[in-house]
A protein has these predicted regions:
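Perimembrane helix-loop-helix junctions
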Residues: 5, 195-231
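Helix-to-loop transition at the C-terminal end of transmembrane segments
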Residues: 29-49, 139-140, 236-251
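Membrane-proximal lumenal/periplasmic loop motifs of glycosylation machinery
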Residues: 38-43, 56-99
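Membrane-interface micro-motifs in multi-pass membrane enzymes
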Residues: 44-46, 73, 122-165, 187-189
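Transmembrane-helix motifs of polytopic, lipid-linked glycan transferases
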Residues: 96-121, 159-163
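Membrane-interface alpha helices of multi-pass inner-membrane proteins
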Residues: 158, 173-196
Length: 251
């Protein structure tokens, strides 16, 4: 293989990487642009509940930790209250911010996991192209302001996974941070609590399979912090949504 052909292959691979990363980013940009252009600033379905009760702006613990739709969602309700206070409840502004931050965050975190795991930009970009299928604004945006609460736990979980897998800082610093991220995921929506539990158990199992020695112990210790967060959040979630409410969809 000549130097010229090597150079051509290198440039071709570089352009392919850029193209495969560009399309998902472009899709997110167009989704945000479409929402700014065609979005309607009006509450929709579940958004009306806070207005009718007159507490949509409330940050009281009783309000934030109430059980609604078979879940505790204090993190999401707090974000809704802040949006009401500082954005005037503007649906267009709120959903644009949540769409770009949540979907953009998921894209960035997945790219980081791919590039760190594969150690090859071309392979990572090919895999990254598949995130384009999750960039459907109508999934969690374009209807209720609060619908994105169900996607937000993924951001916290992926952040925790990044710390577990790649962070080399002291467990004394990383452990509590992983716990906080897990608790945020678990108290954003009930699916987040279940996701944290499943993820932590999976990570602990992988620590025996993928690593050995000190690295395996460190990986497992960080996973234990995530497990603690899963137990902390899933216990009240299960109590309020299944035991107390008896699985009845209310609110």
């Amino acid at each position: 293989m000549t130097i010229k052909s090597i150079k051509i292959n290198f440039l071709l691979g570089k352009y392919i990487c850029v193209m495969f990363v560009f399309f998902p980013v472009l899709s997110l940009f167009l989704g945000g642009l479409a929402w700014l252009r065609y979005g309607i600033d009006i509450p929709w379905f579940d958004d009306w509940r806070g207005y009718m009760d007159g507490n949509i702006h409330s940050l009281s613990l009783d309000y934030l930790f109430r059980s609604v739709n078979d879940t505790l969602a204090p993190v999401g309700f707090a974000l809704d209250a802040l949006a009401q206070r500082y954005l005037g409840g503007n649906s267009i502004a709120y959903q644009f911010i949540s769409m770009i931050s949540v979907l953009g965050g998921l894209m960035w975190l997945q790219w980081r996991l791919l590039i760190q795991s594969l150690q090859d930009k071309l392979q990572a970009s090919v895999c990254f192209l598949l995130v384009i299928f999750m960039l459907q604004p109508d999934s969690y945006w374009g209807w209720e302001n609060l619908a994105y609460h169900q996607a937000l736990p993924l951001v916290f979980i992926l952040m925790a996974i990044n710390l577990i897998v790649f962070s080399e800082k002291s467990i004394k610093f990383i452990g509590p941070l992983i716990f906080i991220l897990g608790v945020f995921a678990g108290f954003t929506y009930i699916s987040g609590a279940v996701g944290v539990l499943v993820c932590s158990v999976t990570m602990m199992a992988l620590s025996y399979y993928l690593f050995s020695g000190e690295k395996s112990i460190n990986f497992r210790q960080k996973s234990l912090w995530l497990l603690a967060a899963g137990l902390t959040s899933s216990t009240p979630q299960i109590y309020f949504s299944i035991i107390k409410a008896r699985g009845t969809h209310t609110g």
